[in-house]
From Swiss-Prot:
Name of the protein in question: CASP-like protein UU7
Region named Disordered: 1-24, 70-100
Subunit composition and interactions: Homodimer and heterodimers.
Source species: Physcomitrium patens
Positions on the Cytoplasmic side per record topology: 1-184, 272-277, 342-353
Keywords: Cell membrane, Membrane, Transmembrane, Transmembrane helix
InterPro entries associated with the record: CASP/CASPL, CASP_dom
Protein family per UniProt: Belongs to the Casparian strip membrane proteins (CASP) family.
A single cellular component GO annotation: plasma membrane
One Pfam family in the UniProt entry: CASP_dom
Protein's membrane topology: Multi-pass membrane protein
Transmembrane segments: 185-205, 251-271, 278-298, 321-341
């Protein structure tokens, strides 16, 4: 829309003097004037649409003229804009300029034109953004523009330090610290302990076999599956490993991705509590029954000791180790149940507030 010409063409286009002319405004006289423009109701359009930027201010001032946003008509009264900018500014006050002419005046601190004086403060850079308003707001023949001034403060040591402090990106909080709560950390430890203890108990018990013999007779190989209590212990520990692995995987999803397999926190909490309590009872029953068999193997029944009579010290020791690990698994599962109860209490307290 607009064209930018050199300062030499200012006198030809507007009949104004660039330095020391009659229409030059001194810095003291124009200091009180602000970025305001005269009323355009009495202006007569001349068909020109020119923006002038002086060579003196091009290096220090940045003026952005959007191609599609500047559309204005009208000049000052009189031939070639003979009225002085300061007088025009005093007579006509309007917040919407029709056209802004910026050229070099007598003072380096004042930029003036046909539509009024413009006082530039001591800033490092100034950007003018021109936005065209809808035609309905300006009528059929008059078109106004909306002016926005964006000022950038000069660089100072204190300002640069403050800007550096603001621009330094804050460290992103890791997802592990974001989603992992103290109760979640305890759940991690409990689930991992359940998996490890149950797995070791299964390995020790399944590898337990020994030949049963006496000095006179060889009865063959004695294995764990010959005892129903030991088979029950293995079955319960397998179920515990499967359940604890699912819970551990869900905790990993919650910590890393922030999502859960069960969307509802109420259903998830009550489900965890129910299964924890179920496997706590199963571990207790399996461990006590297997412990009873191990005790009978050591002490014997009706005066007959299985371990000492048939030289099964290794078999009995392995069975005792597996039963002991199963008891530790029960204690960890009981701790998980207690933690689930605590979560339910916290949840109920939050709901009743």
């Amino acid at each position: 829309m607009g064209t930018v010409t050199d300062s030499k063409a200012e006198a030809d286009e507007h009949g104004e003097k660039t330095d020391g002319g009659v229409e030059s405004i001194d810095a003291v006289q124009g200091h009180g004037n602000r970025l305001e423009s005269p009323d355009l109701n009495n202006f007569k359009p001349n068909g020109k649409n020119v923006a002038y930027v002086s060579s003196k201010i091009r290096a220090g001032v940045k003026v952005d003229w959007p191609t599609d946003s500047i559309y204005h008509q009208g000049t000052a009264d009189g031939p070639a804009g003979s009225e002085d900018g300061a007088q025009s500014h005093a007579k006509r006050v309007n917040a919407s300029p029709g056209r802004i002419h910026i050229h070099r005046g007598a003072s380096g601190g004042i930029l003036r034109g046909l539509s009024g004086g413009i006082h530039l403060p001591t800033l490092q850079s100034i950007t003018f953004e021109m936005t065209r308003l809808p035609d309905d707001d300006a009528g059929l023949q008059m078109h106004f523009t909306e002016t926005k001034e964006v000022e950038t403060l000069p660089e100072t040591p204190r300002g640069s330090i403050r800007r550096a402090m603001v621009e330094v990106p804050s460290r992103k909080q890791s997802k592990l610290r974001k989603h992992l709560t103290p109760m979640g950390a305890c759940s991690f430890g409990f689930r991992l302990s359940q998996i490890v203890l149950s797995l070791i108990s299964i390995v020790v018990m399944c590898s337990n076999s020994q030949r049963m013999h006496t000095p006179e007779v060889d009865f063959g190989t004695l294995k764990f599956n010959h005892f129903q209590a030991y088979r029950y212990l293995i079955a319960v520990n397998v179920c515990v490993i499967f359940y604890s692995t699912l819970q551990f995987t869900q905790l990993m999803y919650i910590v890393i991705l922030g999502i859960s397999f069960i969307p509802s926190i109420v259903i998830s909490t009550w489900t965890t509590y129910g299964f924890d309590q179920l496997f706590t009872y199963l571990l207790l029953s399996a461990s006590t029954s297997a412990g009873t068999i191990a005790n009978i193997s050591y002490n014997g029944e009706m005066g007959v000791s299985l371990c000492s009579r048939f030289d099964l010290a290794s078999f009995c020791a392995r069975a005792d180790a597996a039963v002991t690990l199963s008891f530790f698994t029960f204690l960890v599962m009981f701790s998980s149940t207690a933690l689930a109860v605590y979560r339910i209490c916290v949840m109920m307290r939050e709901f009743h507030r």
